[in-house]
Amino acid sequence: MCDEEASALVVDNGSGMCKAGFAGDDAPRAVFPSIVGRPRHQGVMVGMGQKDCYVGDEAQSKRGILSLKYPIEHGIITNWDDMEKVWHHTFYNELRVAPEEHPVLLTEAPLNPKANREKMTQIMFETFNSPAMYVAIQAVLSLYASGRTTGIVLDSGDGVSHTVPIYEGYALPHAILRLDLAGRDLTDYLMKILTERGYSFTTTAEREIVRDIKEKLCYVALDFEQEMATAAASTSLEKSYELPDGQVITIGNERFRTPEALFQPSFLGMESCGIHETVYQSIMKCDVDIRKDLYANNVLSGGTTMYPGIADRMQKEITALAPSTIKIKIIAPPERKYSVWIGGSILASLSTFQQMWISKQEYDESGPGIVHRKCF
């Protein structure tokens, strides 16, 4: 660990989870849900020190009495007041640092509205008095973490999925594709198909239970039709899950029907292409000379790529789309849930990166627009 006096902070604000820690570390110190919860009921016990709002794990543990909101939807910050609370919680409660003493590296999804990035910059400098900051593209950081400079990253988190082709360290902006289909949509879909089984999950708190079912039991089928037939013929694929109240529910084909929506968005009533086709289209938008290198370096990143079986299925689907002579390789690092953060930690600790920071002085001279000039 480099001296914590001035070491940079790396904060990866995902739609679902916030990952935060110090540059140079190999894993984030704090990982907590990007949730702000407000009580749904009137407090009656005076002197209990009840708060009017809870953030992160505390909101998660009191979810039964709270209404939970996610300030980031589809990778875009939609509620800035709540987002400020999340950042405040990150700096003061989780990392226990004074933000005015450390440079901060933040992350964002590609193809985000420009205003989103400007407002992030403004809040860091004006609310938290950061000495310096930088905004990096999530997928680029994942590639850093995998130790490559060329490849196509499929980054799929809770709010947004995107494919970013990178060649020799340069992202190719014309070929970046974004798919507003990710973990949260899969959770909602699982809620819907569990209702068909007669299990009702409706509140924001119950959605969190379904998310846990999804993370523990779902997987990607190599051959969907065949798997459906197996599930119909026998109970070999069924698993049980105990709810917080002790009730046990059984889930069968829902286990692989849920993530199948990544490959067949029509399940969710969406007209977009599946993730495999999105990757393929993204590669096809690149120059013909570099496609071969991209096919050989498909890097998966983000929590929604954590399903067992997803790499094999991607291999199968992309092989079917690509020219037959081409070598296709899917790289699924075991730490891919945090690879954006890890990449940020690597980037912020590089000596060559130190001149890239936007300083408070530069911000005071040029205003929030500087972020477009200094960050890719």
From Swiss-Prot:
Compartment list: Cytoplasm, Cytoskeleton
GO biological process entries? mitotic cytokinesis
Question: SUPFAM superfamilies in the record, alphabetically?
Answer: Actin-like ATPase domain
Keyword entries, A-Z: Acetylation, ATP-binding, Cytoplasm, Cytoskeleton, Hydrolase, Methylation, Muscle protein, Nucleotide-binding, Oxidation
GO CC list? actin cytoskeleton; cytoplasm
List other remarks: In Drosophila there are 6 closely related actin genes.
Name it: Actin, larval muscle
Q: Which organism is it from?
A: Drosophila melanogaster (Fruit fly)
Task: Output the lineage of the source organism.
Answer: Eukaryota, Metazoa, Ecdysozoa, Arthropoda, Hexapoda
Task: Tell me the gene name.
Answer: Act79B
